[in-house]
């Protein structure tokens, strides 16, 4: 039970990095000697010291003969920072308990093997499902080359997203919109369509003022990382004056042809081929994976939502349901043309159901 207690602490520490570590994974480390925590830390940003280094610095000489609990296999390769294995070995740690092996081919068990070769008692697998859930985007990209895609939808009880006129502000409650801010902040990128930009002129930023007090305390406003905004714009309809281009952070456009207009330095273009007359979403996701994008939060209209679902690219649905009815003339949730049989419908299973103010939030994953 002691091992579980300390690993749970390491996982809690790792969660603190979920807004800032991209493209790196979230990692926490706790160092224990004689039943006392002598050092702890978590990875805060890519290029900065890893969790083990922070914990070892805190532990100092007390790390000798201690046990290190780490949520991810310590790295053994030289990246932007030195290998954590070397630091653990040099500190004289006697035992290392890792929650999960690193799926990164550069590590992939080599870290644990190196520690064993140095005479350290090594084990892994403790609370592995919790560690994998914390790094689902990193894991998906390492294993498949694709980012983890969360599709956010907001609807009425009868599955409608807007009135026939297009009026949609606001179907869901202020509490639901604040909840969205937190989930946006945890994402590496936010994806939308040119149709949504033209219709709503959204900023698609994380608004620090709408985050909960605990998150604000951990992350002062000046440390807030804005997710990369990605716009699918195959016809080059979005202009440099749209709000999404003017916000802090980067805006990427997925296009099928170059755009010759003058854009701010924070704008980047990805040229993607067409497939059946539309921008190829599968190729786009492959390209984003190559750009080390771990996770994508999608906020778009029914056309892009439906296209992602039909392409089998959605890993998780997050649906906010408001307790109101909009009627049969209102706009639907997703455009899924060509569905004739129930067997052809995209299938999901419920993962979590929670109340958010007066609304309900459904979390669903692929069946």
Swiss-Prot record:
Binds 1 zinc ion. The active site is at 52 (proton donor). One of its GO terms (molecular function) is NADP binding. The keyword Repeat does not apply. Residues 146-367 are annotated as: Reductase. NADP(+) binds at residues 161-164, 170, 196, 200, 234, 301-304. GO terms for biological process: riboflavin biosynthetic process. Pathway: Cofactor biosynthesis; riboflavin biosynthesis; 5-amino-6-(D-ribitylamino)uracil from GTP: step 2/4; Cofactor biosynthesis; riboflavin biosynthesis; 5-amino-6-(D-ribitylamino)uracil from GTP: step 3/4. Its EC number is 3.5.4.26, 1.1.1.193. InterPro entries: APOBEC/CMP_deaminase_Zn-bd, CMP_dCMP_dom, Cytidine_deaminase-like, DHFR-like_dom_sf, Eubact_RibD, RibD_C, RibDG_C, Riboflavin_Biosynth_HTPR. Zn(2+) binds at residues 50, 75, 84. Substrate binds at residues 168, 184, 204, 207, 299. Residues 1-145 are annotated as: Deaminase. It holds the Pfam family RibD_C. Keywords: Hydrolase, Metal-binding, Multifunctional enzyme, NADP, Oxidoreductase, Riboflavin biosynthesis, Zinc. It catalyses: 2,5-diamino-6-hydroxy-4-(5-phosphoribosylamino)-pyrimidine + H2O + H(+) = 5-amino-6-(5-phospho-D-ribosylamino)uracil + NH4(+); 5-amino-6-(5-phospho-D-ribitylamino)uracil + NADP(+) = 5-amino-6-(5-phospho-D-ribosylamino)uracil + NADPH + H(+). It comes from the Bacteria. Homodimer. In the N-terminal section; belongs to the cytidine and deoxycytidylate deaminase family. In the C-terminal section; belongs to the HTP reductase family. Converts 2,5-diamino-6-(ribosylamino)-4(3h)-pyrimidinone 5'-phosphate into 5-amino-6-(ribosylamino)-2,4(1h,3h)-pyrimidinedione 5'-phosphate. This is Riboflavin biosynthesis protein RibD.
């Amino acid at each position: 039970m002691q091992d579980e207690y300390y690993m749970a602490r390491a996982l809690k520490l790792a969660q603190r990095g979920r807004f800032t570590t991209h493209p790196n994974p979230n990692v926490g480390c706790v160092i224990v000697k004689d039943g006392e925590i002598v050092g702890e830390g978590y990875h805060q940003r890519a290029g900065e010291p890893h969790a083990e280094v922070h914990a070892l610095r805190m532990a100092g000489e007390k790390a000798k003969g201690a046990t290190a609990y780490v949520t991810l296999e310590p790295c053994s390769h030289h990246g932007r920072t030195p290998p954590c294995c070397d630091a653990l070995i040099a500190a004289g740690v006697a035992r290392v308990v890792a929650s999960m092996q690193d799926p990164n081919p550069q590590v992939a068990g080599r870290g644990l093997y190196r520690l064993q070769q140095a005479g350290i008692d090594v084990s892994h697998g403790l609370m592995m499902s919790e560690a994998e859930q914390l790094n689902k985007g990193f894991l998906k990209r390492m294993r498949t080359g694709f980012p983890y895609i969360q599709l956010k939808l907001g609807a009425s009880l009868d599955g409608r997203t807007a009135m026939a006129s297009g009026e949609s502000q606001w179907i869901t409650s202020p509490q639901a919109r604040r909840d969205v801010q937190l989930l946006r902040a945890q994402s590496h990128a936010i994806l939308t369509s040119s149709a949504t930009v033209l219709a709503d002129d959204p900023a698609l930023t994380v608004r620090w003022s709408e985050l909960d007090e605990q998150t604000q305390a951990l992350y002062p406003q000046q440390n807030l990382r804005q997710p990369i905004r990605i716009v699918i714009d195959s016809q080059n309809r979005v202009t440099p004056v749209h709000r999404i281009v003017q916000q802090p952070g980067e805006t990427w456009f997925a296009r099928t042809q170059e755009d010759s207009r003058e854009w701010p330095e924070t704008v980047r273009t990805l040229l993607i081929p067409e497939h059946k007359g539309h921008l190829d979403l599968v190729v786009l996701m492959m390209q984003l994976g190559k750009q080390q994008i771990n996770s994508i939060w999608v906020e778009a209209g029914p056309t892009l939502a439906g296209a992602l679902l039909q392409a089998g690219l959605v890993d998780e649905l997050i649906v906010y349901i408001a307790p109101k009815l909009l009627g049969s003339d209102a706009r639907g949730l997703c455009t899924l043309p060509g569905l004739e049989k129930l067997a052809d419908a995209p299938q999901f299973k419920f993962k979590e159901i929670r109340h958010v103010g007066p609304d309900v939030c459904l979390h669903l994953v692929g069946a």
